[in-house]
Amino acid sequence: MFLTNEKIRQLTVGAAAIYEEAEGLRFTKCTADQLAAWKEAAPWIYANAVGSTGVRLDFCTDSDFVTVKTAEYGKYEVKINGLLHAQYAFREADGNDRINSFTVHPGEGVNRITVSLPSHGPAGIISSVEVADGSFCERHRFDTKMLFLGDSITQGWNTKYDSMSYAYLVSEAFNADSIIQGIGGAIFAPSTVLPMDFAPDTVVVAYGTNDWGYYSDYTTYRNAVHDTLAKVNELYGSAKIYVISPIWRQDCGKTTKVGTFDDCCNTVRDMAALFGMTLIDGDTLVPPIMDYMADAVHPNDLGFAVYAANVIKAMK
């Protein structure tokens, strides 16, 4: 039997907005207002803001198969009972059609199925979900809610498996219903911190590495950090708020118009303290060794595993 669009909505986690289109349901990590704000604040970032990072279907079922039909390119990953089972990568360059489908067979009994939509590129579209006739599907039950605000590192750039980014791994460790608004190229931009229909118990803010090369002077950067955290505090003051300072990068020895990389990181530390937010020091998260990095800025899968483990330890 095919699940209705309403049922698919009920099983969805991590979507700030869901749009019903001719090809199916399109899921985005940002609301329409947030997308408009990013387009105004930093137009070059907009393409990275429209995606479906962190969006997944997460449900328990007694069906012996689950078939998902998609209508967009990208990587779709499936976990069965929390363990990565398969990745289905559909790329136009490989000659794939935009319409694709995949089937998983979880085995007998009740199993938890997690289908992660693409973290990069266009927002994922689910055209249909089919399960065995007469089977049940219930949304996974979570213990808490988390919101991640950050740049490409929070988005999980250069991971081989999207669902192995630190934000995904931290969400899983705390059994969290989470929205992951990781946006490649993102900076501290107060105008983009806007309300949405999601009340997190925990908020994680992780910007700064792009700001170091973006802002024209230190004062402008400092004000952006201050004003962004002020907005986060205004909207989510009742939540536990963590601020992650930038992690090591290969070119951290240079000086930009903002100042040294230490100046950049120390400002984040100081502003977090000003608002009474809990700092997670980026220097303690990933070894300053290129074996843990996919490039000069982003961790690889190994680096993200270590990053996540250290964030989890800091939160506990």
Where are these regions (language model features)?
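N-terminal secretory targeting modules
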Residues: 1-146, 312, 316
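Conserved SGNH/GDSL esterase-like catalytic core that processes O-acyl groups on lipids
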Residues: 142-227, 250-254, 259-266, 294, ...
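Hydrophobic/aromatic beta-strand patches that form the interior of the parallel beta-sheet core
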Residues: 147, 179, 242, 278-280
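Residues at the C-termini of beta-strands that transition into short coil/loop
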Residues: 182, 245, 283
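Alpha/beta-hydrolase-fold catalytic nucleophile elbow
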Residues: 206, 244-245
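A short helix->loop->beta-strand "cap" motif at the edges of active sites that frequently abuts
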Residues: 236-240
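Catalytic His-Asp segment of secreted/periplasmic serine-dependent ester chemistry enzymes
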Residues: 249-316
